[in-house]
């Protein structure tokens, strides 16, 4: 199965970007995380469940919330949503397996802990140009 995820952001439910891998260097992770966090909260308020995906032109954003973290990725809208969601859930499970302290809530909020996470998920990510 080929790589389908372009960019990925992992946010704490309070809006802090703990990890991001973005191909375009002009996109500031903390700025985007604020937008995604607000959008997700808005969706939760309206639908009592949050937003699972949305599209902008030819890009689909897929969102999954687990254990106080929001996982967001984007991909071509030509890729089946179920395939993207399965890949995102696989990454989320890997995140919690590698960093179990964040689940136990004894994490000290140091985002440097996650700086090498890209190496663990590289097989899911489209190569950067």
Segments from the language model and where they lie:
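Acidic, low-complexity cytosolic segments
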Residues: 2-7, 11-129
């Amino acid at each position: 199965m080929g790589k389908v995820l372009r960019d990925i952001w992992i946010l704490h439910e309070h809006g802090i970007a703990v990890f991001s891998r973005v191909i375009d260097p002009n996109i500031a992770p903390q700025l985007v995380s604020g937008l995604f966090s607000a959008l997700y909260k808005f969706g939760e308020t309206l639908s009592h469940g949050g937003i699972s995906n949305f599209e902008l032109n030819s890009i689909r954003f897929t969102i999954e919330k687990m254990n106080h973290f929001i996982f967001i990725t984007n991909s071509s809208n030509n890729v089946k949503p179920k395939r993207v969601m399965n890949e995102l859930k696989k990454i989320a499970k890997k995140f919690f397996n590698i960093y179990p302290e964040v689940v136990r809530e004894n994490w000290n909020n140091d985002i440097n802990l996650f700086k090498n996470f890209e190496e663990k998920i590289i097989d899911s990510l489209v190569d950067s140009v």
